[in-house]
């Protein structure tokens, strides 16, 4: 009877050992296939490339923000080589723009979809520095640069006669320019 128990345990442990080996082999094959597929991709995705570019820009600014060579004004937020003022005060689009100009900045100009990532917690809408130029039939930023193609789809359904508001969660709205909303100023450091 004792020999039977020993033999049964040996048989069970042998079967379990074989199952473990098969599972480890399968895991190895899956891991190898996963790594191979990643290395076959032609290049980084646009989002990864953008994230890399932002990281490079951030690295170039590490020595600047707060070190004395560049610093943001009081109540302004430093982020990726820029200073941002996020208002709590409600103003018309023009009054918001005038405030920004008086502080050597402009209403927010969004250059990438991820630019205002530092304020994703907010649910408010803010005036930004984009308006429709009737003469050129194009959306222009305050510096007269055109709206980038990757941002253009967000502006298809807005009324060109209105001013543009942005929500940090990625929503774009238009509103009568004389309405009062919060606004965001942006000052480029570099």
Swiss-Prot record:
Main location: membrane
GO cellular component, one term: external side of plasma membrane
Effect of residue 96 to S: In allele CD94-01 and allele CD94-03
Signal sequence annotation: none
Membrane topology, record value: Single-pass type II membrane protein
Cytoplasmic side: 1-10
Transmembrane stretches, start-end: 11-31
Subcellular location per the Swiss-Prot or TrEMBL entry: Cell membrane
Alphabetical GO biological process terms: adaptive immune response; innate immune response; negative regulation of natural killer cell mediated cytotoxicity; negative regulation of T cell mediated cytotoxicity; positive regulation of natural killer cell mediated cytotoxicity; stimulatory C-type lectin receptor signaling pathway
GO molecular function: carbohydrate binding; transmembrane signaling receptor activity
Extracellular compartment segments: 32-190
Gene: KLRD1
Subunit note: Can form disulfide-bonded heterodimer with NKG2 family members KLRC1 and KLRC2. KLRD1-KLRC1 heterodimer interacts with peptide-bound MHC-E-B2M heterotrimeric complex. KLRD1 plays a prominent role in directly interacting with MHC-E. KLRD1-KLRC1 interacts with much higher affinity with peptide-bound MHC-E-B2M than KLRD1-KLRC2. Interacts with the adapter protein TYROBP/DAP12; this interaction is required for cell surface expression and cell activation.
Domain C-type lectin: 79-186
Protein name in UniProt: Natural killer cells antigen CD94
Matching Pfam families: Lectin_C (PF00059)
SMART domains the UniProt entry points to: CLECT
Swiss-Prot/TrEMBL keywords: Adaptive immunity, Cell membrane, Disulfide bond, Glycoprotein, Immunity, Innate immunity, Lectin, Membrane, Receptor, Signal-anchor, Transmembrane, Transmembrane helix
Disulfide-linked positions: 69-81, 72-83, 100-185, 163-177
């Amino acid at each position: 009877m004792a020999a039977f128990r020993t033999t049964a345990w040996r048989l069970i442990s042998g079967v379990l050992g074989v199952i473990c080996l098969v599972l480890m082999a399968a895991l190895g094959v899956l891991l190898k296939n996963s790594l191979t597929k990643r290395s076959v991709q032609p290049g980084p995705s646009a989002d990864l490339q953008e994230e890399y570019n932002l990281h490079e820009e951030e690295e170039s600014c590490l020595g600047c923000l707060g070190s004395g060579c560049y610093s943001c004004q009081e109540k302004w937020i430093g982020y990726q080589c820029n200073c941002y003022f996020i208002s709590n005060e409600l103003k018309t689009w023009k009054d918001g723009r005038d405030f920004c100009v008086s502080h050597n900045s402009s209403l927010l100009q969004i250059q990438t979809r991820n630019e205002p990532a530092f304020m994703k917690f907010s649910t408010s809408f803010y005036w930004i520095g984009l308006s429709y130029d009737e003469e050129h039939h194009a959306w222009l930023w305050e510096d007269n640069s055109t709206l980038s193609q990757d941002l253009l789809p967000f502006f298809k359904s807005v009324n060109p006669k209105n001013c543009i508001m942005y929500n940090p969660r990625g929503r774009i709205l238009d509103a009568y320019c004389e309405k009062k909303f919060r606004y965001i100023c942006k000052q480029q450091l570099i």
